[in-house]
């Protein structure tokens, strides 16, 4: 029982023309390579690498790809009509409504107060106090409250945060288009080729750049041929960045995915091997996390590369956009923090220069995005990344160093 079907295609842009599922030769000449998935009505996933592509080119490309997605969905529905089976009936889990009503009566305003801060540690402490108080007051009436209270508090917090966001209010007091306090520094570590520290609210990322001979490029054994990668970006998310003490077991899917996103964000602005005959490795260490660490890694990588003397064409910055929808309409907000990502419906991450987009990654929790949401997200993230480049990155290091460290 699901809301499919879903179709997916690759989208290229070669010589000013959109290409569906480009060949290997076409991909080498393409200005962008986008993986797009969607239903017949909406887009559900976007993963893009682009060569400073304009927002309107990206948007029209998604619309072009959607035509083929609709054809694929029709094809799948034809198969379903011919051989498909009847869907299983599914009874959704429901919470204890009586307990939920009692929790709201006792603690709704206290939960609102707990959420109303820009410090996630204070928020967690306040919610811990509320939880203990509720268990103490209601445990006799509801013996199973310890098993049920987590889900009910989650639903209550989600209800409050979403209502606030739709009204234009954020838990940290920002406006919907306002970015958290920003800072950037270079040269914190004296014995590396280049490093940059980028801070956005309670999210902080330290990126270190290292240069080596081209012989040290990463070798990749592909299915059909051996390839090499000259620029490598590795993303580390240690447990201490979120106040935990878990041991490190090596990179997981999250670290691999965020590292790949930050890596392809910088590739379009790197100099050619002839201009700069070095292998380049950047490593981003997340020191503190409250949302958008992957985009913080993009900004940190720009700082580190410029400090190392790598002659990148232009600075690259990244920012995310969130979404809340109701029966009345939708609201988007830039630079979502962890709570807004958790309770919202979209994490629309876009990186690029002031000229155009270099990468996109979109995660959603609803049934898909209409084009008016995508268009607004592209516009808002463009304005935000231009602000970050001008007001933060270029003030920390106005231009690429003219010498290597």
Give the predicted meaning of each segment:
Residues 188, 213, 238-243, 263-276, ...:
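Conserved helix-loop functional segments at active or binding sites
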Residues 246-252, 284-292:
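A short glycine/serine-rich beta->alpha loop
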Residues 3, 87-225, 404-405:
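Extended amphipathic alpha-helical scaffolds
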Residues 2-117, 305-402:
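Mobile "lid/hinge" segments at catalytic clefts and subdomain interfaces of large enzymes
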Residues 1, 253-260, 264, 292, ...:
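Glycine-rich and small/hydrophobic secondary-structure elements
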């Amino acid at each position: 029982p699901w809301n499919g079907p879903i179709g997916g295609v690759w989208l290229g842009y070669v010589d000013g023309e959109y290409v569906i599922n480009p060949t290997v030769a076409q991909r080498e000449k393409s200005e962008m390579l986008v993986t797009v998935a969607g239903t017949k009505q909406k887009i559900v996933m976007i993963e893009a690498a682009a060569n400073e592509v304009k927002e309107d080119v990206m948007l029209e490309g998604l619309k072009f790809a959607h035509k083929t997605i609709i054809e694929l969905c029709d094809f799948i529905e034809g198969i379903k009509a011919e051989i498909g089976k009847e869907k299983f009936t599914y009874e959704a889990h429901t919470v204890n409504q009586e307990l939920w009503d009692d929790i709201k009566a006792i603690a709704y305003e206290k939960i609102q107060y707990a959420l109303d801060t820009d410090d996630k540690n204070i928020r967690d402490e306040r919610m811990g106090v509320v939880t203990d108080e509720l268990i103490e007051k209601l445990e006799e009436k509801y013996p199973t409250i310890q098993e049920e209270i987590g889900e009910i508090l989650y639903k209550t917090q989600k209800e409050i945060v979403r209502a606030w966001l739709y009204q234009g209010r954020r838990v940290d007091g920002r406006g919907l288009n306002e970015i958290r306090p920003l800072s950037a520094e270079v040269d914190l570590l004296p014995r590396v080729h280049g490093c940059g520290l980028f801070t956005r609210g309670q999210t902080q990322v330290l990126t270190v750049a290292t240069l080596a001979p081209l012989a040290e490029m990463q070798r990749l054994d592909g299915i059909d041929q051996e390839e090499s990668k000259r620029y490598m970006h590795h993303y580390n998310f240690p447990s201490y960045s979120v106040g935990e003490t878990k041991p490190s077991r090596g990179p997981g899917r999250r670290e691999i995915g965020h590292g790949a996103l930050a890596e392809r964000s910088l590739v379009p602005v790197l100099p050619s091997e002839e201009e700069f005959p070095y292998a380049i490795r950047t490593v981003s260490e997340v020191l503190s996390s409250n949302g958008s660490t992957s985009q913080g890694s993009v900004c940190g990588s720009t700082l580190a590369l410029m400090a190392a003397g790598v002659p990148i064409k232009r600075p690259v910055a990244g920012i995310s956009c969130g979404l809340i929808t109701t029966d009345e309409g939708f609201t988007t907000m830039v630079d979502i923090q962890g709570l807004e990502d958790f309770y919202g419906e979209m994490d629309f991450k876009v990186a690029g220069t002031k000229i155009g987009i270099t990468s996109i990654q979109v995660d959603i929790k609803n049934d898909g995005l209409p084009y008016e949401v995508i268009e607004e997200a592209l516009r808002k993230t463009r304005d935000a990344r231009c602000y970050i480049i001008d007001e933060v990155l270029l003030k920390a290091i106005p231009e690429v160093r003219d010498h290597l460290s």
